[in-house]
């Protein structure tokens, strides 16, 4: 009788062992949490802010207050899913003279009571071997 239960017990034990694996185990192609201070996340965030400013019709630049949450996904490169807080600066945009990220981050802010903040969700797709980074999705409110 024990002989017939062994083939059933082995797969059951394997299933239980798999369920006990840490939830942070990376699933190929799945989303993985990333530290907001990770250098690759910071690089993607800087790119997102620069692209936001290039695409927005605002007369002033917005700069990064903080990265709230970051995830990444391996997809023919790496796609970063970022939730960020941006704030409107006193730096006005000048036609033909766009500022780079570091310049934008040095822009002064209005007094706290007058600050305009945005929460933005960005998707940044990085393919370093092609020297290519794209902002594939952006929504702010």
UniProtKB/Swiss-Prot annotation:
Domain Cystatin: 29-129
Keywords from the named record: Disulfide bond, Protease inhibitor, Secreted, Signal, Thiol protease inhibitor
MF terms (GO), sorted A to Z: cysteine-type endopeptidase inhibitor activity
Residues the record marks as site: Reactive site: 29
Cellular compartment(s): Secreted
Family matches, as InterPro entries: Cystatin_dom, Cystatin_sf, Prot_inh_cystat_CS
Short sequence motif named Secondary area of contact, residue ranges: 73-77
Gene3D superfamilies: 3.10.450.10
A GO term from the CC aspect: extracellular exosome
SMART domains: CY (SM00043)
Cysteine-cysteine disulfides: 91-107, 120-140
Tissue: Expressed at a low level by the venom gland (at protein level).
Domain of life according to the entry: Eukaryota
A matching Pfam family: Cystatin
Signal sequence residues: 1-26
SUPFAM superfamilies reported for this sequence: Cystatin/monellin
Main subcellular localisation: secreted
Family, as annotated: Belongs to the cystatin family.
Matches recorded under PANTHER family: CYSTATIN-M (PTHR47033:SF1)
Other comments on record: Negative results: the recombinant protein does not inhibit calpain-1 (CAPN1), a C2 family cysteine protease and legumain (LGMN), a C13 family cysteine protease. Does not provoke cell death (PC3 prostate cancer cells).
Function: Inhibits various C1 cysteine proteases including cathepsin L, papain and cathepsin B. This protein has no toxic activity and its function in the venom is unknown. It may play a role as a housekeeping or regulatory protein.
Protein name (record): Cystatin
Source species of the chain: Naja kaouthia (Monocled cobra)
